[in-house]
Amino acid sequence: MEFTPIDPHQHQNAATLLCCNCGTPIDGSTGLVMCYDCIKLTVDITQGIPREANISFCRNCERFLQPPGQWIRAELESRELLAICLRRLKGLTKVRLVDASFIWTEPHSRRIRIKLTVQGEAMTNTIIQQTFEVEYIVIAMQCPDCARSYTTNTWRATVQIRQKVPHKRTFLFLEQLILKHNAHVDTISISEAKDGLDFFYAQKNHAVKMIDFLNAVVPIKHKKSEELISQDTHTGASTYKFSYSVEIVPICKDDLVVLPKKLAKSMGNISQFVLCSKISNTVQFMDPTTLQTADLSPSVYWRAPFNALADVTQLVEFIVLDVDSTGISRGNRVLADITVARTSDLGVNDQVYYVRSHLGGICHAGDSVMGYFIANSNYNSDLFDGLNIDYVPDVVLVKKLYQRKSKKSRHWKLKRMAKEHKDIDASLDYNSRAQKQEMERAEKDYELFLQELEEDAELRQSVNLYKNREANVPPEEHEMDEDEDEDAPQINIDELLDELDEMTLEDGVENTPVESQQ
């Protein structure tokens, strides 16, 4: 008898059995009693995942709640909102999330629908994939920050900005910088005080963030103080209110300044008799007779502070009689010898003054200029008294004076910052002469700031200008007025931004200008 040897590598057919549900033959070695299709039809791996959920939304600040207590700003159908919705679903950790997407709903329906695709193990070694929808009901409520904003004394930190000058141009400029960089988004409220502004915050780090911003844009020094509000004797936990006192260097653009002799030598041996030409995080001075410039950091200034000798309120109008250029220039400044006469002296006397000035590039015979009349002024300053009078000019020219329309309708405008309205005090007469003078002074400062923006292209780069749709005449159709100079500076329409509805700052709140400069 012959035996046929068994080849161990010979293919053997696997045992099969019938699906208990549909009778389809399946591999019996897997240990399953149902086929894959029947498993998908009968097994629900999404069991335990709710099909409806709630999500909290603050109507005031338009933020969504991310438990336990974080409020996040998220647009509809954004990745941030999708993450918040997924975190609200219980049981999602038992399956593997493959895909998630929004299903469009009407924005006013207060419903958010999401389509989810998940994978999970249905039976032994069997992975199935299923898709389902979840609907979220948006519940409107009020977040703690907004709730505190409607009550008094809710702030935890305040930034008090002050500048001891007789005008508000610095704060007009600072206001535009804050709006451009959205540095006011964390502010609870803003109130106007004498010589400055007060910003209130719910958290200390928001105030520190504002201090860092101010350090980057204007020359300041600040001082921190704190006040104990409450203390838990059992845990030792304490609650404080923090105050940051910020003082801006009291020197503004176009101010006439006498530098201390030692400081002038340390700044490149610049002349002591200078003009302030620019304000940023440092103070820039310029010698109008040589065009030399030098920067002064706020830390150096506060070691030995000094005040300006004269400001723009003391400018006098002069008429240009002759301009003789020296051929020396630096940037857009041209050094020239200019002959001027005081406007009020015309027809009275023949007194003329010979001035070396940086305005040689824009001045011509017959133009009007503004300058400081040193020869006819009496200054109460020890620094000025220490100067050699032989080297002090009779006149220092500052800028060219352009004749403008008395009621000029500009084709551009600026955003303004909403201000917290203070309670009306019945004891104050808001129609008094003092109040009217204060309003007129504020309007004059704002008009001077607008003119400064028109004349200084470099200054315009740091602010946002918007198209004024309410202007009476489009800029292309402007006809020169008899009272306006032909070379009066104009802002090109290409420099203007379109004002979008969502960029509006006055959402149901009456806007009042907050004075702000340069």
Swiss-Prot record:
Q: Where is this region: Disordered?
A: 466-491
Relate the assembly described in the record: Associates with the 60S ribosomal subunit.
Q: Which InterPro entries match?
A: Nmd3 (IPR039768), Nmd3_N (IPR007064), NMD3_OB (IPR048898), NMD_SH3 (IPR048899)
Motif Nuclear export signal positions after renumbering to this chain: 493-502
Gene Ontology CC terms, in alphabetical order? cytoplasm; cytosol; nucleoplasm; nucleus
Give this protein's Gene Ontology molecular function annotations. Answer: large ribosomal subunit rRNA binding; protein-macromolecule adaptor activity; ribosomal large subunit binding
Protein family membership: Belongs to the NMD3 family.
**Function of the molecule:** Acts as an adapter for the XPO1/CRM1-mediated export of the 60S ribosomal subunit. Unlikely to play a significant role in nonsense-mediated mRNA decay (NMD).
Query: What keywords sit in the KW lines?
Result: Cytoplasm, Nucleus, Protein transport, Transport
Which compartments is it annotated to reside in?
Cytoplasm; Nucleus, Nucleoplasm
Mind giving the lineage of the organism this protein is from? Answer: Eukaryota, Fungi, Dikarya, Ascomycota, Saccharomycotina
* Additional remarks: Present with 11900 molecules/cell in log phase SD medium.
Q: Does the keyword Cytoplasm apply?
A: yes
Indicate, by first and last residue, each region the UniProt record lists as having compositional bias (Acidic residues).
478-488
Q: What superkingdom does the record give? A: Eukaryota
Q: Provide a GO biological process annotation.
A: protein transport
Which organism is this entry from?
A: Saccharomyces cerevisiae (strain ATCC 204508 / S288c)
Q: Where is this motif: Nuclear localization signal?
A: 399-415
Question: According to its UniProt record, where is this protein mainly located?
Answer: cytoplasm
Q: Can you say what this protein is called?
A: 60S ribosomal export protein NMD3
Pfam families this protein is in? Answer: NMD3, NMD3_OB, NMD_SH3
